[in-house]
């Protein structure tokens, strides 16, 4: 390689490369030019590899010149890249301009789910009249869910279409009554509790879901009467719906774990008892089942049914939430639609 010719070519090469860098309009263009001159097969790289063809006297001189040229190109590349990036940022800021005079956006806040809100209200009202709260497992045995509650082996509630059975002879509780059995086994009267929680049944439609919430109540003592049961439930319903003149009625019914048993109706809160689609034009809405605890249940937990007496009741939390908030489809509570849920906050 002729020394003077190589030097002339090197100067032309640097000038041409810098001109290309200065005319580049994008980072992509810069990378292509960089590869052309500074890449593994670029022209500067080829010149550096050609140093071995020079004489020992020429090699250090040309090596220094080529490295200087390489440094000039790298500086030009960095300068142009910074310029293009600043230009791109300015254009982006112009497109996404921020008006600092606008008020700030607050952080979104969550709210209490309407079913949870209803459950809290129920617990608070019963707590105000002396009831404690008891909880228990959601996976139960046949004994606690059925046998101890006087539900015979051939009772329809034990069928697969009503109950979720799991391995090991266990099942998902179909009501929170098992909590009462656990509690009575471990506590002596007087007993005055409610048992809120999730329960499970094989059912799904407009008014039923496979999982829902119940609150069951129990009062065991020496002189608890059916009139006390009526007084507690009437007081609760009138406070829950905030209607002091709410009409109620008790109808005879049957439950294996209570005797006598009754179902409680209230005057339809949608039409004030006049009759509408919600109440089936009857003017009444069924809200809960209740009764005096059956002697067989007492015997299963070791209590003397001659000495102690009590009442029990059970109500659906979603049912009361639907009536309180005017919701006509139970499934809306579990679809996680924020448009629906935000109405309650």
UniProtKB/Swiss-Prot annotation:
Binds 2 magnesium ions per tetramer. It is an enzyme of class 6 (ligase). InterPro entries: aa-tRNA-synth_II, aa-tRNA-synth_II/BPL/LPL, Phe-tRNA-synth_IIc_asu, Phe-tRNA_ligase_II_N, Phe_tRNA_ligase_alpha1_bac, Phenylalanyl-tRNA_Synthase, tRNA-bd_arm. GO terms for biological process: phenylalanyl-tRNA aminoacylation. Its cofactor is Mg(2+). Gene3D superfamilies: Bira Bifunctional Protein, Domain 2. Its EC number is 6.1.1.20. Mg(2+) binds at residue 259. Coiled coil: none annotated. Belongs to the class-II aminoacyl-tRNA synthetase family. Phe-tRNA synthetase alpha subunit type 1 subfamily. This is Phenylalanine--tRNA ligase alpha subunit. It comes from Nitrosomonas europaea (strain ATCC 19718 / CIP 103999 / KCTC 2705 / NBRC 14298).
């Amino acid at each position: 390689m002729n020394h003077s010719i190589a030097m002339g070519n090197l100067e032309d090469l640097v000038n041409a490369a810098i001109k290309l860098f200065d005319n580049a309009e994008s980072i992509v263009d810069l990378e292509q030019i960089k590869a052309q001159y500074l890449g593994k097969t670029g022209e500067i790289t080829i010149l550096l590899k050609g140093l071995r063809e020079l004489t020992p006297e020429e090699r250090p001189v040309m090596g220094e010149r080529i490295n200087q040229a390489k440094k000039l190109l790298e500086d030009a590349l960095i300068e142009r890249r910074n310029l293009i990036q600043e230009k791109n940022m300015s254009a982006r800021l112009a497109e996404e301009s921020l008006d600092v005079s606008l008020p700030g956006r607050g952080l979104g806040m969550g709210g209490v789910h309407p079913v949870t809100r209803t459950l809290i209200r129920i617990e608070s009202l019963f707590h105000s009249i002396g009831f404690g709260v008891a909880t228990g497992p959601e996976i139960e045995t046949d004994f606690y869910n059925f046998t101890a509650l006087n539900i015979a082996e051939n009772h329809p509630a034990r069928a697969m279409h009503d109950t979720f059975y799991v391995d090991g002879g266990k099942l998902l509780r179909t009501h929170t009554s098992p909590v009462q059995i656990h509690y009575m086994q471990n506590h002596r009267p007087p007993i005055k509790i409610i048992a809120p929680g999730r329960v499970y049944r094989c059912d799904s439609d407009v008014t039923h879901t496979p999982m829902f919430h119940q609150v069951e109540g129990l009062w065991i003592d020496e002189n608890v009467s059916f009139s006390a049961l009526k007084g507690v439930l009437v007081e609760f319903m009138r406070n829950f719906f905030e209607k002091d003149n709410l009409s109620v009625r008790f109808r005879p019914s049957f439950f294996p774990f209570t005797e006598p048993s009754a179902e409680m109706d209230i005057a339809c809160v949608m039409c004030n008892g006049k009759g509408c689609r919600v109440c089936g034009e009857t003017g009444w809405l069924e809200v809960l089942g209740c009764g005096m605890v059956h002697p067989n249940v007492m015997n299963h937990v070791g209590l003397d049914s001659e000495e102690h007496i009590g009442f029990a009741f059970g109500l659906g939390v979603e049912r009361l939430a639907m009536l309180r908030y005017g919701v006509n489809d139970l499934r809306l509570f579990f679809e996680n639609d924020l448009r629906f849920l935000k109405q309650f906050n």
